[in-house]
From Swiss-Prot:
EC main group: isomerase
GO cellular component terms listed in the entry, alphabetical order: cytosol
Protein name per UniProt: Ribose-5-phosphate isomerase A
Transmembrane region(s): none
GO molecular function list: ribose-5-phosphate isomerase activity
Pathway where it operates: Carbohydrate degradation; pentose phosphate pathway; D-ribose 5-phosphate from D-ribulose 5-phosphate (non-oxidative stage): step 1/1
EC number: 5.3.1.6
Source organism of this protein record: Neisseria meningitidis serogroup B (strain ATCC BAA-335 / MC58)
């Protein structure tokens, strides 16, 4: 039986093949991305630099002598590599379990291609089992929570966590996310919301799944 970490590593190592040399790339956050950074560092593949979405990813990139640059220093990114908490057959995702989804959306939007890497347990027919992270301004937390409650969700403050931008995270359980694009937009319209963890406008272009049979490359709506 292959462990979850081994499945993540399988996907991460396959993703290195999708990284073009002599280009700037974007790097996400999370345990699967840690395996990807390790694989990229050991591959010998040369890139100009990487824009990191978190301090932890940046530190790991530096360990492998991969140049870390800011998004303001580059005109665009060839590819963005990141994991997901859930990903559906249209390659729309829920992300932000690590609280970095605002930065992740910014970097993803600057990239020509989004490669999602995950173990096979993250591939679902319908989003919503994983709680949806919503980054909120602290002073609007109660207001936003009431609005989310009215939308059918069960909001819960992520205790003791502050985002990179000094905001709070409300994790929303039980939302009906049959229409991810609509839900993403509706939540972002709530005053006091900075960003939510539905990636429908910035869906992945390619999904690389780590499975018992090896790495599986999936494109939108292939099933």
């Amino acid at each position: 039986m292959t462990t979850q970490d081994e499945l993540k590593r399988i996907a991460a190592e396959k993703a290195v093949e999708f990284v073009p040399e002599n280009e700037y790339i974007g790097i996400g956050t999370g345990s699967t991305i840690n395996f990807f950074i390790e694989a990229l560092g050991k591959s010998g593949k040369k890139i100009k630099g990487a824009v990191s979405t978190s301090k932890k990813s940046g530190e790991l990139l530096a360990q492998y002598d991969i140049p870390v640059v800011s998004l303001n220093e580059v005109s665009g990114l060839a590819v963005y590599i990141d994991g997901a908490d859930e990903v559906n057959h249209a390659l729309q995702m829920i992300k932000g379990g690590g609280g970095a989804h605002l930065n992740e959306k910014i970097v993803a939007s600057a990239s020509e291609k989004f490669i999602c890497i995950a173990d096979e347990s993250k591939y679902v027919s319908r989003l919503g089992k994983f709680p949806l992270p919503v980054e909120v301004v602290e002073s609007a937390r109660s207001l936003v929570s009431r609005k989310l409650l009215a939308m059918g969700g069960q909001p819960e403050l992520r205790i003791g966590y502050t985002t990179f931008y000094g905001n709070q995270i409300v994790d929303v359980h039980g939302l009906n996310i049959d229409q991810p694009l609509t839900m993403e937009d509706e939540i972002n319209k709530i005053t006091g919301v900075l960003e939510n963890g539905i990636f429908a406008r910035d869906a992945a272009d390619v999904l690389i799944l780590g499975t018992e049979e090896g790495a599986k490359v999936i494109y939108p709506c292939q099933g």
